[in-house]
Amino acid sequence: MKKIILLLFSVIFILSLTTILSANEDIKKHSSCKYCGMDREKFAHSRMLIEYDDGTQVGTCSLHCTAIDLALNLDKTPKLLWVGDYSTQALINAEKAFWVIGGTKPGVMTKRAKWAFAQKEVAEKFLKENGGNLTDFDGALKASYEDIAEDTKMIRDRRRMMRQKMMEKK
């Protein structure tokens, strides 16, 4: 009996370890965002992975950069869209996720944050603590497209300030 229990725990441990290691395969394959260059491991809680029907993949840091890729590749059909769960950082199906828009937590590449959660209860708890609105993927993507002009200006301003600071240090 002890051998069976030990064997069972060993199998569970190995499967868990395999799942954890494969969960970050997308980060190894796409370590930085194609559009802004941000470190996808650092932003694992907001990263996205697009799998197109032609077999190509694109790794981004956020829904903002994913929206850009989807707009630039109108002739390619997304087969799967993955997003990092805000609370666990595991990749989940973006179209099945519960999305929170807005709130007090600063967003990634955007003024109006957009976070994905695998579980509705976790998203609702986050809402109570941080504010925002609950939506689905289509609502989050629409919000991202609505925000792109203002977000692009914000990103340009930040980068200009960073360049000025670097010049002052020289």
Describe each region flagged by the PLM.
Residues M1-A23:
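N-terminal export/membrane-targeting signals
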Residues L21-K170:
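Intrinsically disordered, low-complexity terminal tails/loops enriched in metal-binding residues
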